[in-house]
Amino acid sequence: MAAASSQGQVMQNTNYQQELQHAESLLAGLTTNDIPHHIHYDLTLYDREGHESTATYDIYRDPILYERTEIKAADYQLTHITNVRDHVDWQHYTGDVPLKILDFERAVILPRTAVDRFAQEPQNIKPMQMQQLEDTPLLCANDQAGTTICFSPLIHLFAYAQMFNRTIMYDQWLPIGTHSVPGSIHIYQDKKLLVEATGTVEAVSKFPDHFMQVPDAPSMPSPESQYKIIKSKSLDQSDARYGNIQVEVSVDEKGHVAKESIIDSDDKHLEGAARKFARNLVFEPRMKDGQPVPFDASIYVEYYPFFPPEDQ
């Protein structure tokens, strides 16, 4: 899925930061002048063994006021409401976040992981160049170290992102007011499909009463706030690969990991490094009735090495 260079003579902006800002100004949810809307995605997810499952992902936005996200994926169900004006968040969920939902959340609307990487290394981003992907012209920026972001020069929106062997493809952009959302998102690991998302968007004249309001019931704490890691060793990131790994750990009374197992992973090549990393974690002991007790936790490991650019 690598994009091949093109010698097209069309004059285009070659400054990545300017193109990114232009794209973000066109995306629904990233500015304050959206119209109220509802985005719905039907997801097909594939686990480490290739088993298929389905999920739905809904975003309801009343700009400047509220945003509501609902995810339904087998045993995992989430409702998250944000009072944008008062900066109040509320959530209720069941089960653990499936790994492929995490992958999708980092790619919905824009390739957040790649954008964040570029933000950490602006000095490495060269002037963008025109390239071709399956006969489609793209305007691409790369860091010479494994990460590429490509825009469609015709609509100034994201088309493609690559982090080593991870590929994210955006297509069928859908208008909503003066903004857009991707109607199609595909996430690949090497040539293996991990996530397929098909979306729709509609304007909403009025949301049901109380639908967007933060409930009086207390918000559930985030899963990661239920434990505290007090000691860790660096993750071995010597392979030029990208991927996320979900690991279940059994922690003893002293906070040491007694057992670790892979729940799901994007890339089996990375499981050994993730297990070793998890095995060496030390948690703050969990107390019950004044006594330390064992517990289980699900952790998510991101494997995204940083190598010096090839031309340095």
Predicted features along the sequence, with ranges:
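Beta-turn initiation residues at beta-strand->coil junctions
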Residues: 43-45, 70-74, 90-95, 143, ...
